[in-house]
Amino acid sequence: MTTTPCNMNITIRITRSTITFTAPNTVIEGQTDFEQYNMKSGIAVAANLRQALAECHILKTQTAPERQTSVATSQHHPVFDTATVYVDTPLLLIPAEEYDEEAMPTLYHHVNSQYKDDNVVGTPIPQINVVAAYAVGKDLSFVLTETFRTVQFMPLLAPVLVEFCRHSYGGFQEKLFCYFHDRRIDVCAFRKGRVRFCSAFDVSLTPDAVYYILNVWQTLGMKRTDVLCLAGSITGHEALLKELRRFIKNIRNITI
């Protein structure tokens, strides 16, 4: 069955290594299309995105002639008016009750000085009672607004944090959560539905991952009988478990 495209949304996920596009198929009802672009090293993220948009099969094929006529003078895509864009820059989690929109950029740039030339966006994550502050490159924003009428940014880690918080309930043991992706570990802990700890570490080798996890474990005063939850794409999974089990009794793999 053919659908009538109107104010359709495409989801774009930008990581260190890939750009992915996910969108509803405008011809086959109920079908979702997915496409991945591998980042080219040596060029900026915005340049990679511009190339990915130019090559994206979804954007080329999902067209609506009846709308193209009405938007002939528009620079924006004739079918996908809006884009939800997940970006993977460092997060600064601010308690919702302490959030100050005017102070947010200064606070973020103080902690993440390498992003001082980027815009800072704040996205509420009400499920864990925080506002996530994160950087969005000005060039990246420009490339996106050239193609889409409306662009909504989201932190890549937001849905992961919400899911981890859900898993944190139940039982009397403390839980530490680790999300592996793109040669990085995001490590977080919760207590009574609030963020207790959240940080990210770059890792390329299993010993590095073990070191950072155990360092956080010790810093938080966690016991051998507490619970470590692992998720994501884990390189050297068995070797990692072997080392961690020397110090941590309860290790769980969870799917998010």
Please identify what each model-predicted range represents.
Residues N7, F80-T82, Q173, R224-V227:
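A general structural motif
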Residues M1-I28:
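N-terminal basic/disordered segments at the start of proteins
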